[in-house]
Amino acid sequence: MAKPTTVKIRLVSSADTGFFYVTRKNPRNQTEKMSLRKYDPVVRKHVEFKEAKIK
């Protein structure tokens, strides 16, 4: 089987709640780190989520 082109990443909340989303990205097309504005249920607001490695 071929090696997958996408890698799994964590999107960690910038509100320091410890909440994160897991998603995938293609590192060939998206070379810079992802930064998305998503919902954080701990603070019940939309906050910035930044890319981090999955441990």
Swiss-Prot record:
<dbReference type="InterPro" id="IPR011332">
    <property type="entry name" value="Ribosomal_zn-bd"/>
</dbReference>
<comment type="similarity">
    <text>Belongs to the bacterial ribosomal protein bL33 family.</text>
</comment>
<dbReference type="Pfam" id="PF00471">
    <property type="entry name" value="Ribosomal_L33"/>
</dbReference>
<dbReference type="InterPro" id="IPR018264">
    <property type="entry name" value="Ribosomal_bL33_CS"/>
</dbReference>
<dbReference type="InterPro" id="IPR001705">
    <property type="entry name" value="Ribosomal_bL33"/>
</dbReference>
<dbReference type="GO" id="GO:0003735">
    <property type="term" value="F:structural constituent of ribosome"/>
</dbReference>
<dbReference type="GO" id="GO:0006412">
    <property type="term" value="P:translation"/>
</dbReference>
<dbReference type="GO" id="GO:0022625">
    <property type="term" value="C:cytosolic large ribosomal subunit"/>
</dbReference>
<keyword id="KW-0687">Ribonucleoprotein</keyword>
<protein>
    <recommendedName>
        <fullName>Large ribosomal subunit protein bL33</fullName>
    </recommendedName>
</protein>
<dbReference type="InterPro" id="IPR038584">
    <property type="entry name" value="Ribosomal_bL33_sf"/>
</dbReference>
<keyword id="KW-0689">Ribosomal protein</keyword>
